[in-house]
Amino acid sequence: MGLKVFHWLNRRMHSNTEYCSIHGSKAMEDKDSVPHSVVEKDTEALLLHDVLLNGILAIGTLGHHVDSLCPVACIEEDDLFIMDDEKAIVEERDDEEPRNDQVKEDVALETEPCEPVWPIVEPAKMHSLSMKEDNFTCFVAEEILIREVEDGGGANIQERPLLMLEKVEKVRTTLADLFAAEVFSSSSPREYSCQDIIDVAVASTSKHASCMEKMHQKKPRKPTPKPLKATRKLSRVMRKMLGKKIHPEQLNGRSNAEGPLTA
């Protein structure tokens, strides 16, 4: 079905004699009269006419002129035509030699260098050239902006793009650094050495630890309950019983020292 539609469109766009509707008997007579080799050449020419253009596959253009799709090929063909015309004019002038001085002067006037003929540029080509120029100007503008930002210093930090800000090394600020900054701001302005900064940081951390200990000490503690009388008696009895079981020799020693019991 797709091939039928393609052939119908090809016949509509290219109204050649081969595609015209001719009576069947007449077509057979014409076919018999035309040699077989000529028919093969014509079919090959028709196939290659719309399929190949300077080695480029052109199927799917649906009969439109392929030169409009490639403006570079059009410009080259125009240049060739102009060069051929100029060569033909020069050859004609060389063949017709003037016979008198007046004719020579006329020919000299005619052979003066004329204005160069510029080839017509297609809109697609002009559009591509303008796009290239715009891209080049944008690229140059970005280069200039980046160089200005690099040379500007700290005044142009806010104008830099966000990607450049990510390269800055981030320093972690601790609680000791904050306490040290408070001490520096409250004290009189003087030069501090590295040892002074370390001492202030250690003092701030120890102060923080002592504050935490005080908070823990301030928590209310439950008083230990006093043991009851019954529990005290029970613990005393248990200690006695355990002492008898664990150390029976003590009891034997006591009994021997006291002597035999009398009834």
From Swiss-Prot:
The keyword Ion transport does not apply. The keyword Cell membrane does not apply. One of its GO terms (biological process) is phyllotactic patterning. Residues 243-263 are annotated as: Disordered. Keywords: Growth regulation. Highly expressed in leaf sheath pulvinus. Expressed in shoot apical meristem and leaves. InterPro entries: TAC1. A motif (IGT motif) lies at residues 55-61. Involved in the regulation of leaf growth angle. Promotes horizontal shoot growth. Belongs to the TAC family. This is Protein TILLER ANGLE CONTROL 1.
